[in-house]
């Protein structure tokens, strides 16, 4: 029964085994930044233009459902702030049961492999995965290589992080992009679970799309990108361009043209 539920919920956030999700959980971390003040308008724009799912903290759920259309909804269950002493120290913000009551199709949880808080985060992710499995809810693990002396984009480190996430019970794994198709293939090969890349800091449109294209060519299952989209001058158009790369195998130039965006250098 739980496997059927998990499959059904996975199909609500991705219907072709590829995933474009727009995380909007930055309010805890950074405050009400541009693009998230009127989060309802942003949700409407991105979901109308190809986002498969949006992601927020549980308390934002009432602002999500009236505006997301048919898109899926992922609830994130831990956080830290830029005002705190250690951003790698992610603390629980809810339970799987809270997420289900909030109408989630999946839950997500962040772990920093290599940080001082890694042991506690492994335990917490395992607990979330066990609770989610019991309820038939998919788990998206945000598994990063972060900590003192840790190279956040090293393929071996990222491969370790995604394999850890699989072994603890994640169904989909988000991690940083290693910077090249060849190196990211090693990350993807480290796990049997779908791997999606984080968007990272905003860059030029073509550069962003080329990175996603390269990751997809390496075997990535999609992308989870927030500020690149919701702080874009036209979030809907940027969502459409990314969707073309993820779901239609478009190259950056074709994706930009399809979305009506100017091809930058």
Curated annotation (Swiss-Prot):
It is an enzyme of class 2 (transferase). The keyword tRNA processing does not apply. GO terms for molecular function: acyltransferase activity, transferring groups other than amino-acyl groups; fructose-bisphosphate aldolase activity; hydro-lyase activity; transketolase or transaldolase activity. It comes from the Archaea. Keywords: Amino-acid biosynthesis, Aromatic amino acid biosynthesis, Schiff base, Transferase. Its EC number is 2.2.1.10. It catalyses: 1-deoxy-D-threo-hexo-2,5-diulose 6-phosphate + L-aspartate 4-semialdehyde = 2,3-dioxopropyl phosphate + 2-amino-2,3,7-trideoxy-D-lyxo-hept-6-ulosonate. The keyword Heme does not apply. 1-deoxy-D-threo-hexo-2,5-diulose 6-phosphate binds at residues 25-29, 144-146, 199-200, 226-227. PANTHER family: 3-HYDROXY-5-PHOSPHONOOXYPENTANE-2,4-DIONE THIOLASE, FRUCTOSE-BISPHOSPHATE ALDOLASE CLASS 1. Catalyzes a transaldol reaction between 6-deoxy-5-ketofructose 1-phosphate (DKFP) and L-aspartate semialdehyde (ASA) with an elimination of hydroxypyruvaldehyde phosphate to yield 2-amino-3,7-dideoxy-D-threo-hept-6-ulosonate (ADH). Plays a key role in an alternative pathway of the biosynthesis of 3-dehydroquinate (DHQ), which is involved in the canonical pathway for the biosynthesis of aromatic amino acids. This is 2-amino-3,7-dideoxy-D-threo-hept-6-ulosonate synthase.
